[in-house]
Amino acid sequence: VIHDTTLYDYPSYNESYDRSLKGVAKMLEENKNTDIVFDIHRDAIADSTYAPTVKIGDEEVAQMMFVIGSNGGGSEHDNWNDNLKFAIKIQEKANELYPGLFKPIILRNSRYNQQLARGASIIEVGSTGNTMEQCLNSMKYLSKVLSEVLATV
């Protein structure tokens, strides 16, 4: 696992994917065995009172959502179908283990740098209204789901 903590959205959010393209491409070049890339962050919704959660056991957990880029905007993105299939596989396992952990998958016309790797996706963890505790709780369940899915790939 490679955890990149670079702040690609500083100084301007509008160019964050241009900046992250260079960083992710460099990481993939330096780590040829990397097959899966997740862009994990909170959903930047202007309404900071919106905080999607689900109760798992006794915990309030931020709901997550896959955002999958495509070639719908005219940019080359040959592996978007593979990325979507992989997200569906993860989401199906999550629904089996922890119903409600994920909101429905969103398919977009932008690439979000997902053209760089098969199995690439955005995982939005809650929104700006969720607490850090709710988001960290989600990571615990996401790691269990990924562990089961990756054991079968």
Task: Please identify what each model-predicted range represents.
Residues V1, N31-I36, A62-Q63, G100-L101, ...:
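Loop/turn elements at helix/coil->beta-strand transitions in domains of secreted/extracellular proteins
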Residues V1-T53:
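Catalytic-core regions of hydrolytic enzymes
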Residues D4-L7, D39-D43, I68-N71, I106-N109, ...:
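Active-site-proximal beta-strand/loop segments in catalytic clefts of secreted hydrolases
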Residues T6-E15, V24-M27, P52, G72-N81, ...:
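Second-shell loop/turn segments in exported
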Residues D18-A25, L84-Q91, A120, L136-M139, ...:
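Extracytoplasmic/secreted envelope proteins and their assembly/folding machinery
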Residues A46-E76:
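A short, glycine/acidic-enriched catalytic loop
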Residues N79-I106:
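Active-site-adjacent substrate-binding region
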Residues K103-V153:
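Active-site-adjacent mobile loop/cap segments within catalytic or ligand-binding domains
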